[in-house]
């Protein structure tokens, strides 16, 4: 099941990247990892760097995908974002923390993508 969930996650991230590029974002990083945490997608548009968490699900039985971005997960993303900005020397940008929710339909290849800008703040 874990392997299956990972492949759903990677597929959701690929769909998210395609969506963001169509919306005019440039992708800076995908799956950025450091000791502080991981960021699924880092993108930029209009001088705003977006740190994006992607949550993909087949069911809302465990709540909406965004609800799984807990306070501790938010802290890890924020710390990883600070580290990323520091090592890349990106000091003169606005930043934003977004969530992309993807709800897959079990009986078809359809899905719903919901882009939640400014989903949480520092």
Curated annotation (Swiss-Prot):
GO MF: nucleic acid binding
Pfam families documented for this protein: UPF0102
InterPro entries: Restrct_endonuc-II-like, tRNA_endonuc-like_dom_sf, UPF0102_YraN-like
HAMAP family, alphabetized: UPF0102
Annotated family: Belongs to the UPF0102 family.
PANTHER family registered for this protein in UniProt: UPF0102 PROTEIN YRAN
Protein name: UPF0102 protein CPE1705
Organism: Clostridium perfringens (strain 13 / Type A)
């Amino acid at each position: 099941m874990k392997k299956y969930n990972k492949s759903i996650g990677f597929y959701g991230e690929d769909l998210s990247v395609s969506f963001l590029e169509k919306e005019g974002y440039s992708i800076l990083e995908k799956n950025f990892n450091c000791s502080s945490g991981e960021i699924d997608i880092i993108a930029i548009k209009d001088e705003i760097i977006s740190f994006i968490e992607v949550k993909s699900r087949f069911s809302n039985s465990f709540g909406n995908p965004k609800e799984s971005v807990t306070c501790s997960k938010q802290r890890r993303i924020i710390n990883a974002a600070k580290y990323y900005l520091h090592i890349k020397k990106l000091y003169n940008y606005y930043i934003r923390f977004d969530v992309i929710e993807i709800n897959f339909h079990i009986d078809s290849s359809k899905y719903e993508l919901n882009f939640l800008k400014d989903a949480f703040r520092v």
